[in-house]
């Protein structure tokens, strides 16, 4: 009952090349690989350059389309670019999860209309998570996926400690 997602996180795209994409695609043929991810854009850090991240994001969306696998999307401080690129690439046809969703209701509505699930984790318990709590109240329950992002983003009362699935009850209670 163990399955995998195969993809390159945006923070690792500076080292990505076509040979690695071919290797990822060959891995996606394995019956235990069920998604392409975690792929997307991360503008929190200055590197890798946004243009490099965008290039490989599109390339991995194309890989998901060709392998007929859903996607797991990473988007940090890149709401507009991520959404625009996903629309342009018709990512709604693939479906998947917006991992660690952290934007507001308007962006959530766009993703939900595309058929994506929203990943909700420990951040929803933070005092400054008002927008995310509004999203959780707005979104249909069947469109939410509980996540840990282990070992990161532990919920209150364990914020700053190592996260694990043992903390999911705090996310549910939020």
Ranges and model annotations:
Residues 1-2, 32:
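A generic structural motif
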Residues 5-6, 34-39, 141-151:
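Non-cysteine beta-strand/loop elements that form the S-adenosyl-L-methionine
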Residues 10-19, 23-114, 134, 139, ...:
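Divalent metal-binding pocket/active-site signature
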Residues 8-10, 102, 122-126, 150-151:
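Short, acidic/turn-prone active-site loops that include or flank metal/cofactor-
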Residues 115-129:
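His/Asp/Glu-enriched short active-site or ligand-binding loop at hydrolase and phosphoryl-transfer sites
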Residues 173-174:
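Short glycine/serine- and small hydrophobic-enriched flexible loop segments
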